[in-house]
């Protein structure tokens, strides 16, 4: 189990770095958006490339932020009975949710997003907008993000099994959201 826990903590470290990149992308997207608005409405200058950079950065925000959100246990969850369960019950729900829903869904998404990226990369697909950018960098964010969410899911499953077997101590405090 110790080798698996080392793997899980290594994945956590990578996810944290991805989260930092996502946070930086949010700032860059906001600055570029403000700059685009100023140039467009203040100086009557527009650039499709700069507009498209914004959605590239949005892809980074979402796809690189997702594994970090999962690591921090801050993801959206449908709380019907979760908050009423014991700590052990919540850990079991998390573990089963990861194994039965998260990992299979990420597998399907990886299966379909990888060929999409490869096709865009091989053909050099460009934006249809004048002055637009190549599309494969944004498409690459999909399989990369799904892969990282998958790895983070495996990490979370390992840590929960570790908690259940008393070989890993984790904070399982759950704060029910305001309703």
Feature map (PLM): residue ranges:
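Alpha-helical transmembrane segments and membrane-interface helix-loop junctions
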Residues: 1-179
């Amino acid at each position: 189990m110790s080798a698996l826990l080392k793997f899980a903590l290594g994945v956590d470290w990578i996810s944290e770095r991805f989260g930092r990149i996502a946070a930086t992308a949010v700032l860059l997207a906001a600055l570029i958006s403000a700059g685009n608005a100023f140039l467009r409405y203040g100086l009557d200058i527009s650039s499709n490339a700069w507009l498209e950079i914004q959605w590239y950065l949005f892809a980074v925000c979402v796809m690189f932020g997702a594994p970090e959100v999962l690591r921090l246990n801050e993801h959206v969850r449908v709380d019907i009975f979760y908050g009423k369960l014991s700590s052990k019950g919540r850990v079991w729900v998390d573990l089963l949710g990861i194994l039965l829903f998260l990992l299979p869904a990420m597998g399907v998404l990886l299966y379909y997003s990888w060929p999409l990226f490869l096709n865009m990369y091989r053909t050099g697909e460009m934006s249809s907008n004048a002055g637009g950018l190549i599309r494969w960098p944004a498409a690459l964010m999909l399989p990369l993000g799904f892969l990282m969410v998958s790895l983070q899911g495996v990490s979370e499953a390992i840590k929960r099994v570790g908690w259940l077997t008393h070989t890993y101590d984790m904070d399982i405090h759950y704060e029910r959201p305001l309703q």
